[in-house]
Amino acid sequence: FAVPPAISAALARRLEHPIFGYEWPSAKLHGVVVDWLARRYGWQVKAEDIMFLPGLVSGTNLVMRAFGHAGDEALCWTPSYPPFLGAPANNGMQLKTVTLAESAKGHEARYDLDFDAFERAFTGRSRVYIHCHPHNPTGREYTRDEMARLGELCLKNNVVILSDEIHCDLMLDGRPHLPMAMVSPEIAQNTVTLMAPSKTFNVPGLGCAFAVVQNPVLRKRMHNAEMGIVPHVNVLGQVACEAAFSECDAWLDDLLVY
């Protein structure tokens, strides 16, 4: 679908400026993201917690690089978005999967968490848990109690949580989205949350996403791991992100009704 008019207008204005060199995300853009998270989800984060990225697939691989080594393990529910399944191997890690328990609820499929199987999947080499919320491809939204239990297991086993929440803006029927990092302060300190305007506003080709990393120790490891590997965020992507998160609330609300 077409992007919101405010995004098109912002891009047109930027194109009138003839210089397209490297550009660091501005303090204003950081503030716009912070305000968006507070406004839409009641999530209070600081500008310094935001790390901009060219995309969430690169962000997923960056997390593996930052927190795992060859032979270490990453956990993931299946079925799953294919890049999640490939990211551990890209970084010399092993993938351990736990299958969602499928059942029928009326005319719809239901996917439940097998906590016993999940807990058994942890070993001394477990380093990252890949949490997709809402889940791709099932569309499943995790409850607070489920995330608390998952988060506590990760804390117990010293496993970093990678929470990909790229579809969170598209919850239907007025259902609220609760970020994994809002479940508890302890879980927040153990979570890297990946988000982007790309799915919500149809701008994935502009290459602008971000990680929310509230623990400065984890954030430093992310910064160290990205050096020389992760490219700059696209200049036009930054413009689109700023417009999307500062001028398009009403457009998104109408989209969700539609």
Where are the regions that the model predicts?
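Hydrophobic residues in well-ordered beta-strands that form the structural core
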Residues: 76, 97, 130, 161-163, ...
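Conserved core segment of the aminotransferase class I/II
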Residues: 9, 184-257
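Helix C-cap/helix->beta junction micro-motif
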Residues: 91, 156-157, 187
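Short acidic capping loops at alpha-helix termini that bridge into adjacent secondary structure
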Residues: 44-50, 70-73, 125, 188-191
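Active-site phosphate-binding strand-loop segment of PLP-dependent enzymes
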Residues: 101-175
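N-terminal small-domain helix-loop-helix segment of the aminotransferase-like
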Residues: 1-55, 62, 244-247
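A short helix-loop-beta submotif of the ANL/AMP-binding
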Residues: 90-96
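Conserved PLP-anchoring active-site segment centered on the Schiff-base-forming lysine
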Residues: 66-88
